[in-house]
Regions:
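Amphipathic alpha-helical polymerization modules
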Residues: 1-137
Length: 137
């Protein structure tokens, strides 16, 4: 029964990580410089999952749930014509992050719904465990 809680917990952690990445993408959609001040736009980050959480295993050693396998930067930028911008190149273009706020918002809703589904699953498991304890006691 605890395996079900481990699975839900791994899903909560994975979706929280995904939502943090989406939030960072939205916040940095207009970040056009790197730490050194050069026109090097923020790169969109994408979270990838893999089945099985190495920290949650059955007695047989089988991994349960899900885990974040990687967080990768998606290369690319959007060139905008802004000749008066101090970061413009010789042709007057400035590199901006290739981030679509509407797409990120849809991903955020999806992550939120998956997070909520994991909470419901954990609550159902908790209720089942409480009922089983009442039967035993």
């Amino acid at each position: 029964m605890y395996g079900a809680l481990d699975i839900s917990t791994s899903g909560l952690i994975a979706q929280r990580t995904r939502l943090e990445s989406i939030t960072a993408n939205i916040v940095n959609k207009d970040t056009i410089t790197d730490a050194s001040g050069r026109n090097n736009p923020y790169q969109r980050r994408v979270v990838f999952f893999s089945p099985g959480d190495p920290t949650a295993t059955t007695p047989e050693g089988k991994a349960l749930g899900v885990h974040v396998s990687s967080i990768e930067e998606e290369p690319g930028f959007e060139a905008r014509y802004e000749p008066s911008n101090p970061y413009a190149d010789d042709k007057g273009y400035v590199k901006y992050p290739a981030i679509n706020p509407a797409y990120e918002q849809i991903n955020a809703y999806e992550a939120q719904r998956a997070y909520e589904a994991n909470i419901v699953s954990a609550e159902a498991t908790k209720t089942m465990m409480a009922q089983a304890l009442r039967l035993i006691a």
